[in-house]
Every structure is written in C-alpha cells, then in structure tokens.
Amino acid sequence: MTVLARGERATQIENGGICVTGLSQFTQPVRVVRNPADLRSEVLVVAIKGPDVRAILKSIPAEPISTALSIQNGLEKNDLLIDAFGSHRVLGALANASGEMFADGKVAFTRNAGIYIGEFDGASTGRVAQIIAAIDGSGVRAQASGQILSLEWSKFAAWAGMMVLSVTTRAATWKYLQDPSAAKLIVQLAAEVSQIAQALGVKLTDDSVLPVAAMCAGTETEAVNLVMRLGAQFEQSAPQHRMSSLQDLDAGRPLEIEPTLGYAHRVALKLGVSDPTLEACLSLTRAIDRTQR
C-alpha cells in the first residue's frame, strides 16, 4: 500500500504510520509519496479534499493504473476521474463510514456502515470483487453494488442537508437531526436533489444514511418526523458523530462546496431543474467558508 500525502500529514505517516483508534485499533507503516508524479499504483483510491483535486489527478501517471475510484463526497468526483484516466478505468464508489483525524495524526474510526463499489453499468466483475475483498478483509465493511449511481446520488441527497446543517449549527449530528426546523431543511434539500437525479434517469433508494426515497415519497411532515426519529437513533448509536464538514470548519480547512453542492446546482441549471433551497444553501455555505478562514 502506498499513500499520497502532503505537508505535515505526510511527515506524520512517515514517522508513525497510519494510526487508527475507535472501532479498530492498529498502527500500520506504509510507503508515503509526496509528489503525485511519483505515484505508481495499479488501483487508485481517492480520498482527498480540496480545490486542487483536478490538478493532482492530472499529474498522476495514468499508465500503471488499471482501476480508479473515489470515496469523496458529491458526484463531481466521477467526472474528474474519467477526465484524468478514461471511463474504462473508473468505478463508482461511496463510503458510508465515518472518522475524525486529530492534530497528532491519529484517526478515530467511529462508524463502519460500509463502502460500496460497482461498475457504472451494473456488471459483476473480477476487479470489483478483488477490491471489495481487500477492503473488507482489512476490517472496513465493503460490498459490491449493481446500482452504484443510485447509491451515490442517494448518499448525496442525505449528505447535502446534513453538511449544510453541520456548518451552520456546529452541533453534533444527532442534535440537528432532532430539530424540526433543521429536519425540514434536510427534507427540502433531499427532495431537490431527488429531482436532479430523476432528470438524469437515476432513482434514489433508502440504502443511505437517511432513507431518502421514503423521505421523498410521503408528505413533508412525514419526512420531517422520520428524520427526527433517526436523530434519536443517532443520539443512542453515535452521540459523538460530527460531519467531516464540521471538522474541516473547526480546523480552518476549506469546505467541500464546489464538488458537492456547487456541482449539483450546476447540473440542475443545465437540466432546467428548479433548486431554490440548494441554491440558497450553496450561497450560505460559500459565505461561511470565505469568512471563517
């Protein structure tokens, strides 16, 4: 395993390996590469954040890579990988897992619902099976999916509202999920993302951190009550859970806005889908990002 890292994080990994606490406890030495041009890997897993992702991908040599996938938030990630490496090398993927990295470089593994990987055409392939086996064997739950685009959009439909509420309330996840006003905004954003996905021919499912298909199928009041009930479950099962967006805000790091909310809004504009709530939240989070750093 080789890790592409920069700055202080690269030094931490070089000196102490990858140190994980929480649901799993281990320290693993790994090879560190600081220059993307020096990376040589058969399978590339992208898990970085920041505005320079496109440039980094473009600087990674494509020839050794047979398969590339990204567990970043949002949907722009797939376009970036396809642009850099070609569609034949790219798999869909999403992470329904959580963690938090501390200043000393240690990572708290706090939620292990799973990582999903699949071919965009739904085919069952050997490369998907091999990657799933490697990840699952490491202790992180992983499984193949024949409807990966549906899962990716379903995750984003839930993530969008949770991200916005995390950086506006700065509260633990369960707290705003149980707030009726916050839950209403989450429901409204999920409905707009669902309309964008439908315009692309993608159907949402309930296989996500929030059951977005059910949220969009009933009345708004029913959906709000459902989100609030899930908030109570979060309070019991993951009381310390904080969105990575809130972690980034507290640490003074840039927020994931343009590849996530921004990308969805651009797709909505292109398709002629009305998204007033998403557009307003995009402006709000951009302002928070600019003024808090």
Residue spans of the language-model regions?
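Conserved active-site and cofactor/substrate-binding residues in soluble primary-metabolism enzymes
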Residues: E8, P51, E76, G126, ...
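Short alpha-helix immediately C-terminal to the canonical SAM-binding loop
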Residues: A10-I13, N78, H265
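Generic preference for hydrophobic
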Residues: V3, V32-V33, I117
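NAD(P)-dependent Rossmann-like dehydrogenase/reductase catalytic/cofactor-binding core
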Residues: V187, A191-R293
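Rossmann-like NAD(P)(H) cofactor-binding subdomain of soluble oxidoreductases
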Residues: L23-A108
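Active-site-adjacent beta-strand anchor residues
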Residues: V3-L4, V46-A47, I71, G146-Q147, ...
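NAD(P)-binding Rossmann-fold cofactor-contacting core
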Residues: M1-S24
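Internal alpha-helical scaffold of NAD(P)-dependent oxidoreductase catalytic cores
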Residues: Q12, E63-P64, A84-R89, A108-P211
